[in-house]
C-alpha cells in the first residue's frame, strides 16, 4: 500500500472585527500593492518573494472589471458596511512537491472552478513557493452571491416561521414570527468536510495521472487510524524565523514530534518482529520431553 500523507487544509473567515481587510489579504497573497478605499490604507507587498502565480476566476454574472484585484476586493469592502463584517473566506492547502509547476496550477484551477466558481463565488488564488519544499496555495473567496445584473446580492433574508398548516405564526405584537436564513448554502457547516475531501480527491487524481505513487488524505491521522502524531502549523512568522536558522517554540515542538514519530515507528517495528517470532514459535511442532 502506498504511503498516505495527512494534508492540513485550514479554512477561515477574514473579519473586520479581527482588524483584517480583504484588500490587505489579497495584496499579501498576490505580492501586489493595493489601496483599501474603505479605510484609505495602502498595503504594499511588491517585495514579497515566492509568488509563483496569482489569478482571479469569476463566475457567471460577475462584472468583467472584477478581474482587477483592486476593483474586486474594494467592491467587497464597500458593500460591507459594518465594522464587524465578514469579508471573505480563505482556504490554504499544501501542493504536492511531486508535481511540476504547471501540474500544480492545473490542479488548483480545476478545484477552484468546480467547487467554488461554478457555485457563484469569485475566487482569487495565489501559489507560493520559495523553493524550500513547502509549495502551497491561498484561495480567497467572496461571501455574497451576485445578481444577474452583476450587483452584489444579500447574504441573508427574512423568512417567516410557519405552523403545521404552513401558515404564518403571529408574534403577539401585530406582526409575524420570523428568522434570518442564508441566501446560499456556502456557510453550511458540512462544506468544510466536503471542500477538504474534494481537495484530497483532486490531488490524488492528478498525482495518479502523473504516475506518482504518493497519496494524500484530508482526514487527521487519528481518523485514518494511523498511529502518528501530526506536526503543528508553524505560520508565516515562525516559518521565516526557522528558515533563517532561528529556533522557535513551534519549531521545537515539531522537532520533538518528528523524534517521537521515529521512535513510535521503531517500537511498532519491534512489536511486529516480536509478534512474528512468537507466531513462528507457536507453529513449531512440539517435542515431548522424556521423564
Language-model features: locations:
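N-terminal nicking endonuclease/strand-transfer module with a His-rich metal-binding environment
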Residues: 1-291
